[in-house]
Amino acid sequence: MPIADMLINEASGHRVITFLDGNAGYNQIFMAEEDISKTAFRCAWFIGLFEWVVMTFGLKNAGATDQRAMNLIFHDLLGVILEVYIDDIVIKSAGLGNHLADLRLNLERMRRYGLKMNPFKCAFGVSAGKFLGFIIHEKGIEIEPKRVEAMKRVEAPTCKKDLQKFLGKVNYLRRFIFNLSGKISSFTPIFRLKDEAEFTWGQNNKSHLRRLRIICLRRQYLRCLREGSLLGFMWLQKIKLLVLF
């Protein structure tokens, strides 16, 4: 499976975007003849046994199989004019003229392989849209509004499971939070408690939770120092060079 963060980065920063969503994408892949019997299921009222001739939802490798099929179909277009995550397709272009050509190339490829999209979930030639839980557009990436609203409704956890749910929501926004691991380190001792140990939520934990919520609700910006100028940087950890731009 592709790395979602990388796809989001590659899909953002373009002026014109088209979003396509597969119409029951799994069902567009035929089952191997020798594996059809493994999908047998029975119905009520003694109707009998039925078998799937197309890939159904819930199979262990269904997602990976769908992604592999899409990679084979769009192998020469991936990372160039489009990005694909299972049955979600983003066609990206610098301008409208280029986008029409890119869109035609993509649709011709889909027609050749018989791919069908859900027209109610598609958006053509727009400037912004939702992809993998984030809003992407020419200027970058934004947090989806409903995730911000979810953070507003967060209450103090009463057990380890509640805390895990909250940190799961925070981790989804990690690209917008500097030094996230350091900001959540105060919660580490709680996760080390044994199941039979009493869950204690102290004043220090409350203040850290409140501070973390404020950070998540604050709009984040990444802006170049001067428009039109080049910017280079190095990212190092101790004396080991990690990234050079």
Segments and roles (model prediction):
Residues M1-F245:
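Retroelement reverse transcriptase polymerase core
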